[in-house]
Amino acid sequence: MKTVMSGLDLRAIANELSRMVGSHCKKCYQPHYEQVVLRLRAKSGGNTDLVLIRGKRIYTSQRDRPMPQYPAPFAMVLRKVLTNARLKAVEQVGFDRVLRFVFENSHGAFHLYVEVFRDGNIILTDGEDMIIQPLTHATYADRTLKKGVQYSPPPAAQDPYDLDFDSFSQLMNSSDRSLGRTLGGVLNLGGGISGAICADTGNDADAEIKNVDLSKVWDSLQGMLHGEWKGYLFSGKDGYEQAWPMVLTT
């Protein structure tokens, strides 16, 4: 199972989940202390569970799952605010591993932020991003997540969609990391996609950037960013192990 999601994974997921815009939230559950399930009903009928696991992943499901007999406090807050609210938008925050789900009801707009990086959180805010309730209260060096304060995402990651070739080359040449680590970390692409770009361009992931033809890396990156995303499962000896928005060559 995929355990780490990159910024590009989240971009693909946001695009896919946009088909659910217009659905209404009918139920909110918290089957596990790190997991929230929103049961969404489409305009055409039929329910789909939106499964949110803080710090890990986001996916949809239609399988039956046991739910707690009594809702946890966070689930109760979600039910109070989001029951019968309409999903208006699914947005990635920059190129970060954060999705914003925009809901609307007769009282106005509400945002549900889902952070899928290490020590991430799930945060319910009003339409002005004032925190109504986080899944867990937390204080970091650069932000605080607690009721009554303004939500602020983590420091913004580099968005590769904002780069042209010149700025890309400058960013790469200023890095003291290897090619693979720069693509995966500085550009927030993750290990799998950065490894695929290295393989596609005939480079070792540990190669020094000064020895790399960056025009080939740029072309491969553009293919990843602007290619057709369908979603692919890759299996190993123990079953399905990874999911990617495109076929990776490694």
What are these regions (language model features)?
Residues 1-250:
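Extended, highly charged segments
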